[in-house]
Swiss-Prot record:
GO terms for cellular component: large ribosomal subunit. The lineage of its organism: Bacteria, Bacillati, Cyanobacteriota, Cyanophyceae, Synechococcales. CDD domains: Ribosomal_L1. Transmembrane segments: none annotated. Part of the 50S ribosomal subunit. This is Large ribosomal subunit protein uL1. It comes from Prochlorococcus marinus (strain NATL2A). It comes from the Bacteria. Belongs to the universal ribosomal protein uL1 family.
Length: 235
C-alpha cells in the first residue's frame, strides 16, 4: 500500500471513484492544483491499441487553441542560409554537422528537434540517443520540413507532438492550472478530436479505454469520455 503525504491524502479524499463530466473534472483538478507553482495539467489516455503492430501505432500533432502555457526549446538541424533563417524564426539552437555532433555526444538542451529533409540522413544516425527520448524528427509530426519559420512558430505557439507509448497510453500536457476552465476545456476537446481523427486503422474493439486528467502534484480525475464526445456533437 502506498504511503501518501498528508497533502495528497487530503486531495485524494476530494476525488470520488467515478468518472466526471469534462468541466467537473477540470474544476476539480484546478482546485487540487494548490502547489506553490503553476502546475501543468496533463491528460493520460488509455487506448484500445497494441503499438507493437504498425497499424495500431499513434503518432501525431495537435495545435491546442489556448496553447500549453509552457516555453519549449527548439533545436534545428539544417545547412547554409537556413541556419540563420531558423535562428531568426525563434529556434533556440540551430546548426549543421556541428549540432549533429553535439547531439551525438549527449548534449541535448532542447525539447523538440526539427530537421530539413536534406539533413535527415545525418540525423537518422542519431537514433540511439534521440529514439528513447522521442526526439527523432518525423514528417508526419511536422518536424521534418523545409518551412522552418512556419514549423518553429507553430510549435512555439503550442503545437504538440505526441504518441501512444508501448502500453497504448497517450500522455499529453494541455495547459496550466492558471488557465481558465473554458481554455482547458477547449484544449481537451481539441485533443480528443485529434486522437479520434488519427485513430489507427488496425484498432479493434473498444478504442477509448480510460481518460484521466491530473496536475503535476495532484491526484488523477477520470473524465467521462462519452460526455466529452457529446460536447463535440453540440458544436
Amino acid at each position: 500500500m502506498k504511503n501518501f503525504s498528508k497533502r495528497m491524502t487530503t486531495l485524494l479524499s476530494k476525488v470520488e471513484e467515478r468518472s466526471y463530466s469534462p468541466i467537473e473534472a477540470i474544476k476539480l483538478v484546478k482546485e487540487n492544483a494548490n502547489a506553490k507553482f503553476d502546475e501543468t495539467i496533463e491528460a493520460h489516455i488509455r487506448l484500445g491499441i497494441d503499438p507493437k503492430y504498425t497499424d495500431q501505432q499513434l503518432r501525431t500533432t495537435v495545435a491546442l487553441p489556448s496553447g500549453t502555457g509552457q516555453k519549449i526549446r527548439i533545436a534545428v538541424v539544417t545547412r547554409g542560409e537556413k541556419v540563420n533563417e531558423a535562428t531568426k524564426a525563434g529556434a533556440d539552437l540551430a546548426g549543421e554537422e556541428d549540432l549533429v555532433d553535439s547531439i551525438n555526444k549527449g548534449e541535448m538542451n532542447f525539447d523538440l528537434l526539427i530537421s530539413t529533409p536534406d539533413m535527415m540522413p545525418k540525423v537518422a544516425k542519431l537514433g540511439r540517443v534521440l529514439g528513447p527520448r522521442g526526439l527523432m524528427p518525423n514528417p508526419k509530426a511536422g518536424t521534418v520540413t523545409t518551412d522552418l519559420e512556419g514549423a518553429i512558430k507553430e510549435f512555439k505557439a503550442g503545437k504538440l507532438e505526441f504518441r501512444a507509448d508501448k502500453a497504448g497510453i497517450v500522455h499529453v500536457r494541455f495547459g496550466k492550472a492558471s488557465f481558465s476552465e473554458e481554455a482547458l476545456l477547449e484544449n481537451l476537446k481539441t485533443l480528443q478530436t485529434t486522437i479520434e481523427k488519427n485513430k489507427p486503422s488496425g484498432a479493434k474493439g473498444k478504442f477509448w479505454r480510460s481518460f484521466f486528467i491530473t496536475s503535476t502534484m495532484g491526484p488523477s480525475v477520470e473524465v467521462d469520455i462519452n460526455e466529452l464526445q457529446d460536447l463535440q456533437k453540440e458544436k
